[in-house]
């Protein structure tokens, strides 16, 4: 982290959490949070009460999601972005270590 008076620069590749899904808070803009997550373990199935943007900054992630009650999955590579609308059930399974930028409503699971 390089910090000035009005800017912060985060070097995502140098962030390592003490546990899976550890997060570094980057910003909270009117109740919308931006957090950098580090993980090497799957999350849990969940449904957000708001929209979610999930950007893979480093590594690969298999994202499972349900559309019309049917489970599907896709591999997200570094640079890929997953968008989940309100009410979309999903779960992320990193394939090794991954660093992920998540933008969502404050307090989301």
Whereabouts are the PLM-identified features?
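A short, N-terminal "cap"/entry segment at the start of jelly-roll beta-barrel domains
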Residues: 1-36
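Short loop/turn motifs at secondary-structure junctions and domain boundaries
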Residues: 17, 45-46
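A cytosolic small-molecule/anion-sensing beta-strand core signal
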Residues: 30, 57-58, 77-78, 96
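Short, conserved beta-strand element in jelly-roll/cupin
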Residues: 38-39, 47-66, 103
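Short, surface-exposed secondary-structure edge patches
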Residues: 44, 53, 72-74
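Short acidic-glycine-tyrosine-enriched beta hairpin
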Residues: 67-86
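Ligand-binding loop in jelly-roll beta-barrel domains
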Residues: 86-109
């Amino acid at each position: 982290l390089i910090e000035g008076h009005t800017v912060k620069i985060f070097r995502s590749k140098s962030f390592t959490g003490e546990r899976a899904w550890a997060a570094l808070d980057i910003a909270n803009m009117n109740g919308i949070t931006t957090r950098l997550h580090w993980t090497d373990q799957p999350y849990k199935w969940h449904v957000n009460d708001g929209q979610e943007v999930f950007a893979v900054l480093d590594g690969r992630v298999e994202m499972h999601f349900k559309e019309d009650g049917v489970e599907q999955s896709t591999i997200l590579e570094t640079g890929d972005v997953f968008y989940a609308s309100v009410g979309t059930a999903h779960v992320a399974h990193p394939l090794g270590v991954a660093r992920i930028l998540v933008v969502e409503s404050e307090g989301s699971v």
